Curated annotation (Swiss-Prot):
Protein name in the entry: Cytoplasmic protein NCK2
Gene: NCK2
GO cellular component assignments: cytoplasm; cytosol; endoplasmic reticulum; postsynaptic density; vesicle membrane
SMART domains: SH2, SH3
Effect of residue 234 to K: Abolishes interaction with DOCK1 and IRS1
Keyword check for Phosphoprotein: yes
PTM annotation (Phosphothreonine): residues: 92
Tissue: Ubiquitous.
Domain of life: Eukaryota
Residues annotated as domain SH3: 2-61, 111-170, 195-257
Length: 380
């Protein structure tokens, strides 16, 4: 019989959507699914729902492990079935999701070109899936945090379960101790001699809750030395003082790959300003094709609370995102363009200007404590 996993709420959380669950600090909950960035839990009243995974911690022996992975290990090889395509709407929230979360709740990594070896045969069950032949090699083009990857084989492109393949690396890297330790999910206690994966800069201050986490202030530069396979939302980093610990990956921006550069040669973040091309070229709030990270940096460098910009969506070329400077953590809101109507949550607007003017007068976001956020002015 599989061990029942209990988690304890570290902070209060008030549900923002129907599929979420209210929790109170120190409340005892039963973990039902930890396969995504939000966990599904059950409370003492037998109510179930999703909560942010960093708001709870495991109480018993499966700490830092995956409930789904343990079930798979117990029952043998299994695959996570997608009830919808990774490109379709999903009811599962994500800690990295834009608000309101109308699109997929899964985080995705694009523009990859990684060879992978097929460990097990797989027969496609949907039109957008890819059949795999055991022993063959596929090219991974995209990764989705729901456990499915998109790749190509023999001219065909589609989705397949990621645990059916093994990424390939060059022979020298495969034999290195640092690579082997990362593959095994080994803990690097001091970072000495470990391979530096990225150099990152912190976007916000963070106070550790557990001994294995690392405190940091906004603007610090750190080295990423490990990406734990069983805890993908956290990276193990080493700061300038040599301290090592886990940090939430959505609190940092990648500056470069490899070891840190001398401060005199540190990469500089280029100026990001309004776009002279694109659908809303010339509008002071339209920044065009900039990334979420670029928007974050621009808002943090020269914005004040209420400053905003609108950019093209990274995941849906025809859609847009509103990035808003807020105290603590900036907010990002998905705007979908459907039949020439701009949709944000359940609201619809005929023009983007109409949307902007509406949220200058009505709150675009209300926190669990009743704090209201408005679009005040375009980022200067």
């Amino acid at each position: 019989m599989t061990e029942e996993v209990i988690v304890i709420a570290k902070w209060d959380y008030t549900a923002q959507q129907d599929q979420e669950l209210d929790i109170k600090k120190n409340e005892r909950l039963w973990l039902l699914d930890d396969s995504k960035t939000w966990w599904r839990v059950r409370n003492a009243a037998n109510r179930t729902g999703y909560v942010p995974s960093n708001y709870v911690e495991r109480k018993n022996s499966l700490k830092k492990g995956s409930l789904v992975k343990n079930l798979k290990d117990t029952l043998g090889l299994g695959k996570t079935r997608r009830k919808t395509s990774a490109r379709d709407a999903s009811p599962t929230p994500s800690t990295d999701a834009e608000y309101p979360a109308n699109g997929s709740g899964a985080d995705r990594i694009y523009d990859l070109n990684i060879p992978a070896f097929v460990k097990f045969a797989y027969v496609a069950e949907r039109e957008d899936e890819l059949s795999l032949v055991k022993g063959s090699r596929v090219t991974v083009m995209e990764k989705c945090s729901d456990g499915w990857w998109r790749g190509s084989y023999n001219g065909q492109i589609g989705w397949f379960p990621s645990n059916y393949v093994l990424e390939e690396v060059d022979e020298a890297a495969a034999e290195s101790p640092s690579f082997l330790s990362l593959r095994k999910g080994a803990s690097l206690s001091n970072g000495q001699g470990s391979r530096v994966l990225h150099v990152v800069q912190t976007l916000y201050p963070f106070s550790s809750v557990t001994e294995e986490e690392l405190n940091f202030e906004k603007g610090e530069t750190m080295e990423v030395i490990e990406k734990p396979e069983n805890d993908p939302e956290w990276w193990k980093c080493k700061n300038a003082r040599g301290q090592v610990g886990l940090v939430p990956k959505n609190y940092v921006v990648v500056l470069s790959d490899g070891p840190a550069l001398h401060p005199a040669h540190a990469p500089q973040i280029s100026y990001t300003g309004p776009s002279s091309s694109g659908r809303f070229a010339g509008r002071e709030w339209y920044y065009g094709n900039v990334t979420r990270h670029q928007a974050e940096c621009a808002l943090n460098e020269r914005g004040v609370e209420g400053d905003f910009l609108i950019r093209d969506s990274e995941s849906s070329p025809s859609d847009f995102s509103v990035s808003l400077k807020a105290s603590g953590k900036n907010k990002h809101f998905k705007v979908q363009l459907v039949d020439n109507v701009y949709c944000i949550g359940q609201r619809r607007f005929h023009t983007m200007d109409e949307l902007v003017e509406h949220y200058k007068k009505a709150p675009i976001f209300t926190s669990e404590h009743g704090e209201k956020l408005y679009l005040v002015r375009a980022l200067q």
